[in-house]
Regions:
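Catalytic cores of transferase enzymes with a strong primary signal for eukaryotic protein kinases
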Residues: 107-116, 123, 128, 134, ...
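Sec/Tat signal peptide C-region and signal peptidase I cleavage site
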Residues: 20-26
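Pocket-lining segment of extracytoplasmic ligand-binding domains
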Residues: 92, 129, 171-175, 180-272
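Positively charged n-region of N-terminal signal peptides that target proteins for export
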Residues: 1-5
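Conserved C-terminal helix/tail region of periplasmic/extracytoplasmic solute-binding proteins
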Residues: 309-352
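Secondary-structure end/capping motifs
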Residues: 236-317
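Short, glycine-/small- and polar/acidic-enriched structural segments
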Residues: 27-168, 173-176, 192, 198, ...
Length: 352
């Protein structure tokens, strides 16, 4: 009977405990440092989800509490209110927050190629069937309804693409669309095309019959590397924990780069309604590189900030250098060089 087996097991355990010699010194488990981290449901966060599930943070003594949020706009608000210690989101919400005096600090990248400037390879424009926008022909966006998440990376991305072909935002109709609703907007013809970050372009391609890619990346005036952001207050209170967090995140990135299909499967447990096929497609060529470089600052100054000014999302240009702190990535590179071994070395002249 189950009761008898359970009793016998308990009795055996008690007997073993009585007969076992007591340890010379009682072992106590070291308390873990709690870190509250907000992330979006973006494919670029696969390394983070992998690091959480594979225990990379806990092995470093961190108790990471995860907050899922729709976009960087909500994460910035959470950082500003002090309800989270760190956040993973896009360049444009980060720079907008800095321009408004929010005390946020960039301490690493999520999706990124430290050797590239400009870069927009996490973003794509996807069209529905019969949208009238041939692949590669951005001029045909004129007069179309474009689904974007207002205030997030897709909006300045589409603005940059339009500028490249002599169009402006006045030539199109922007439809404010939540990331998870992008495919639905195409299917219901609420939008002719969508401009979004992965995995939402891949989700549209796999879920909406007849949908196709108009352009992948391709913005010549965009610098939109994913950002790992904290606050000045968190740095003052939890600098060591943040150092360990960046180390664990870098290790998660290294694992995800080597195991993209498995990282995609892990991400399905964190991104509602997303399947492994879609996430595998989204992660296939996504650059994952936590390192900061001079390309970060140059990209912000040359492309990201001027674009935000031109779109009247920030009042004026500013120098972002004071809001970029490389010490945490530098510490991670020193602590575990193997987590960076598969990445191309940053040229000496481009290092921070």
């Amino acid at each position: 009977m189950r009761i008898a087996r359970t009793f016998a097991a308990l009795a055996f355990g008690l007997l073993a405990a009585v007969l076992s010699p007591a340890p010379a010194v009682a072992q106590t488990q070291q308390p873990q440092t709690q870190l509250r981290v907000a992330v979006t449901t973006a494919a670029e966060n696969a390394p983070f989800f992998s690091a959480v599930e594979r225990g990379m943070f806990s092995k470093l003594g961190l108790d990471v509490k995860v907050e899922m949020m729709p976009s960087g706009v909500e994460i910035v608000n959470a950082l500003a209110s002090g309800t989270v210690d760190a956040g993973l989101f896009g360049t444009y919400p980060f720079l907008t927050a800095v321009s408004r005096g929010v005390p946020v600090v960039l301490i690493g990248h999520t999706w990124n190629n430290a050797l590239m400037n400009p870069q927009s390879e996490v973003l794509s424009v996807i069209a529905r069937a019969e949208a009238g926008v041939p692949a590669g022909d951005l001029t045909k966006l004129k007069g179309k309804k474009i689904g974007v998440t207002r205030g997030a990376g897709g909006e300045p991305y589409i603005a940059g693409l339009l500028t490249q072909v002599g169009l402006t935002m006045d030539d199109v109709t922007l439809v404010n669309t939540a990331p998870s609703s992008m495919a639905t907007a195409l299917a219901n013809k609420d939008a002719d095309v969508i401009a979004a970050w992965e995995p939402w372009p891949s989700a549209a391609l796999t879920k909406v019959p007849g949908s196709y890619k108009v352009i992948y990346g391709g913005c010549k005036s965009c610098y939109d590397a994913g950002t790992l952001v904290t606050t000045r207050a968190a740095i003052a209170d939890k600098a060591k924990a943040l150092e360990l967090f960046v180390l664990g995140y870098a290790q998660g990135q290294a694992w995800a780069r080597a195991n993209r299909e498995e990282a995609a499967k892990i991400s399905t447990r964190w991104i509602p309604g997303m399947d492994a096929e879609t996430l595998t497609l989204a992660l296939k060529s996504l650059p994952l590189d936590v390192r900061l470089s001079k390309n970060t600052l140059d990209g912000f100054r040359t492309y990201s900030i001027p674009l935000l000014v031109s779109q009247k999302r920030i009042p004026q240009a500013f120098d972002p250098a004071a809001s970029v702190d490389n010490r945490f990535v530098a510490a991670a590179m020193k602590a575990d060089p193997s987590a960076f071994a598969d990445l191309k070395e940053i040229p000496a002249g481009q290092r921070l």
